[in-house]
Amino acid sequence: AGAAPFDAYSGDIKLGNKGTLGSALTIITALDFTLTNNFAPTLVIGESTAGDMEFGTASLEGTVSCYFEDATMINRFLNETESALEVSVGDGSNTLTFRMPRIKINSADVGVDGPTSRIVNMSFTALRDDTSLSGSSTDTNTMFYVTKSGV
């Protein structure tokens, strides 16, 4: 039948300064990111398959929303603080961890929609990194890592 799907309750989101990760955040309401490899097939007339793949520049962009508790998250944007982000999800016995050792927060919007909780909506871009947080001693130009534990 396959493995059980990951759920929204068995995981952590950590955010810290570049090169470090803080403790798990408990104020995140949503997180989304997209990794684009920018590969392009080299197709030609008369062939049913591509002869090669052209490699483009990879990019990773995302958004994160969190409850407004204080100015900490907004200050990461205002002060242009390079940050590190780690997202772990699990199903009880397996964990999948996405690590971005160097991100730049591009916006921090706080709407005031009434008397309910205020939400900070932030966009970010992953940047190439050369710190030890990257998890590799040989690859010093990476923006994104995925690790798994369990099966």
Stretch-by-stretch model annotation:
Residues 1-151:
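Signature of extracytoplasmic/envelope-associated structural regions
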